Amino acid sequence: MALTLEELVKRFGGEIAGDAQCKVGGLAPLDQAGPQQLAFLANPKYLSQVESTRAGAVLIAPKDLEKLGAAAGGRNFIVTPNPYAYFARVAQMFIDLATPQRAAGVHPSATIDPAAQVAASAVIGPHVTVEAGAVIEDGVQLDANVFVGRGTTIGAGSHLYPNASVYHGCKVGPRAIIHAGAVIGSDGFGFAPDFVGDGDARTGSWVKIPQVGGVTIGPDVEIGANTTIDRGAMADTVIEECVKIDNQVQIGHNCRIGAYTVIAGSAGIAGSTTIGRHCMIGGAAGIAGHVTLGDYVIITAKSGVSKSLPKAGIYTSAFPAVDHGEWNKSAALVRNLDKLRERIKALEAALAAQGGTDA
């Protein structure tokens, strides 16, 4: 389905520079777009691609359109302060228009406990399990093999993709997206040591600590494929509104993730850690337990956080990749730091002694 620029602006705002009746039916990058497609410029370093693009129209910020000057002539633009966000909204609209609406109802192979509440407008796919006391609200979509445990609520308009599992006693807010294989509410990693003696004479074992809390997920949260969020030991693990979590992230028990925070893939957050609002956690970052990150903290990829960081800012502890030979030289220097320190101390002592003799 193609829409005119005028129709897009009526839906999403912005101003048109060029032909308001230009029709676009999809999106593409600047260097690949054709006359019936919409492209966008989010980074000024690609400004030259706007001059050569074949796109029917381009989403562009006012300052970048000014930089184009005469080169903008004859082209069509939607001028908006945030072309990237505009692109995302238009892309979602085209996806929604192209996606057939699934009929409400329960697939014959699904297992729904008689004590569960399932809204008439919900879509329940093949082999879904909904246990007693669970509540499936209006417009929820549960794809094949989804599991919803006893007493759990799935908020209105949420979509759980195939094989997602939400254990008992959890609350998922409205409009949540939980991707395939994600597990919400599995037991937190809690074991009490019960050992006697030392060394080879040590006897005993680890005693499992029952995890009696749940997981509370706010509205508009998205959780990536194969991500795991542990239930709390006593109180709930909490994911606040509009948090976005990538694939294969581990969030330990009793954590609280503040609203609008984003967490990239393979990050690990140990138990009882609090992350503030509007934070950004890079891929494969590791955050120790029982620490607090303030609002607007950014942790770069592969960094390790071992203490609280209350002040907003960018924090890094990862070592960037370098030439292999350079890395070996650096590693050798690190191994010899103790020897170098002792040599420096000896030189300082000798200089001090020499200075004392001269005096």
From Swiss-Prot:
It comes from the Bacteria. GO terms for biological process: lipid A biosynthetic process. The keyword Nucleus does not apply. It is an enzyme of class 2 (transferase). Its EC number is 2.3.1.191. It catalyses: a UDP-3-O-[(3R)-3-hydroxyacyl]-alpha-D-glucosamine + a (3R)-hydroxyacyl-[ACP] = a UDP-2-N,3-O-bis[(3R)-3-hydroxyacyl]-alpha-D-glucosamine + holo-[ACP] + H(+). GO terms for molecular function: N-acyltransferase activity. Pathway: Bacterial outer membrane biogenesis; LPS lipid A biosynthesis. Keywords: Acyltransferase, Lipid A biosynthesis, Lipid biosynthesis, Lipid metabolism, Repeat, Transferase. The keyword Transit peptide does not apply. GO terms for cellular component: membrane. The active site is at residue 253. PANTHER family: UDP-3-O-ACYLGLUCOSAMINE N-ACYLTRANSFERASE, UDP-3-O-ACYLGLUCOSAMINE N-ACYLTRANSFERASE 1, MITOCHONDRIAL-RELATED. Belongs to the transferase hexapeptide repeat family. LpxD subfamily. Catalyzes the N-acylation of UDP-3-O-acylglucosamine using 3-hydroxyacyl-ACP as the acyl donor. Is involved in the biosynthesis of lipid A, a phosphorylated glycolipid that anchors the lipopolysaccharide to the outer membrane of the cell. Homotrimer. This is UDP-3-O-acylglucosamine N-acyltransferase.
